[in-house]
Every structure is written in C-alpha cells, then in structure tokens.
C-alpha cells in the first residue's frame, strides 16, 4: 500500500513541479494562393504543460503573466511546393522548433489565441500529401 501511495504522490509532484514542455512532431498544411492547393509536411514544434495560475483578484501592481509552452530556438526550412505554375513562387519557408521552454507568448511571432485554426487547416478544398 505504501508503494501505491508513493507512486501517487510522485506522479502528483511530477505534474505540479515539473514542466513537460518538449519538442513534438506535428503535421502542418502549407498553401500557396497561386497554386490553389495545400500539401502536408512534417515538422517539430513545442507542446506540453507549463505551470500557470490565474488570480481571482486582479492586482494592478502585480503583473499576471501566463506562461505557455513555446519555442526557445528555431530554424527555418524551405520546401518547394510541387505542381505550381511556373510564374508562381513555388517555395515555402516554415519554422522548425529546435528547443522549447515555458515562457511568455510572443505575439509578434506566435499565434497566442486560445483556439486557433490548427496547423493542418487548409483554405482550399484540395489537399495533396
């Protein structure tokens, strides 16, 4: 019984005290307006949990900064979108996370909304793999 209690307490401690913000594989849809279709590519991005809290009573003197699992470092990769017209720009550059951390969401480079369209959203009806 003590082993079960220890395991339970250890899991609770791990969930509360330790962040699990890490690199994960995702599939994103890239689209080009001149090509009129999307392609799916695999990349890495940050996902997981970060310690955060939302105060019941807001104090203007104390900033309430929510942390989120976001990239610490990233690189950019470029792919050629096949099947585009010759006059169209057939190259697409996308970010690839190389290191993650729990930090403030930077709205200059990241979609910080509560619920976005998702990485696999395509505005065209045709999706090519």
UniProtKB/Swiss-Prot annotation:
Signal peptide location: 1-20
Taxonomy, superkingdom: Eukaryota
Keywords annotated in UniProt: Disulfide bond, Glycoprotein, Hormone, Secreted, Signal
A GO cellular component annotation in the UniProt record: cytoplasm
Single GO term (MF): follicle-stimulating hormone activity
SMART domains associated with the record: GHB
Any one GO BP annotation for this protein: spermatogenesis
Pfam families cross-referenced by the UniProt entry: Cys_knot
Entries under InterPro entries matching the protein: Cystine-knot_cytokine (IPR029034), Glyco_hormone_CN (IPR006208), Gonadotropin_bsu (IPR001545), Gonadotropin_bsu_CS (IPR018245)
Cystine pairings recorded for this chain: 21-69, 35-84, 38-122, 46-100, 50-102, 105-112
Glycan-modified residues: 25, 42
Compartments it resides in: Secreted
Keyword Chaperone: no
Subunit structure, interactors included: Heterodimer. The active follitropin is a heterodimer composed of an alpha chain/CGA shared with other hormones and a unique beta chain/FSHB shown here.
Functional description taken from the UniProt entry: Together with the alpha chain CGA constitutes follitropin, the follicle-stimulating hormone, and provides its biological specificity to the hormone heterodimer. Binds FSHR, a G protein-coupled receptor, on target cells to activate downstream signaling pathways. Follitropin is involved in follicle development and spermatogenesis in reproductive organs.
Protein family: Belongs to the glycoprotein hormones subunit beta family.
UniProt protein name: Follitropin subunit beta
Organism of this sequence: Aotus nancymaae
């Amino acid at each position: 019984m003590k082993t079960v209690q220890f395991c339970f307490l250890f899991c609770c401690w791990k969930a509360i005290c330790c962040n699990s913000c890490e690199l994960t594989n995702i599939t994103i849809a890239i689209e080009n307006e001149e090509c009129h279709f999307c392609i799916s590519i695999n990349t890495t991005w940050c996902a997981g949990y970060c310690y955060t809290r939302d105060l019941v009573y807001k104090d203007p003197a104390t900033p309430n900064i929510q942390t989120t699992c976001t990239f610490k470092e990233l690189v950019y990769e470029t792919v050629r979108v096949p099947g585009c017209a010759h006059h169209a720009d057939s190259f697409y550059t996308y970010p690839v996370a190389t290191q993650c951390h729990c930090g403030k969401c930077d709205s200059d480079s990241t979609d910080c909304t509560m619920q976005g369209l998702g990485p696999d959203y395509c505005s065209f009806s045709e999706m090519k793999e």
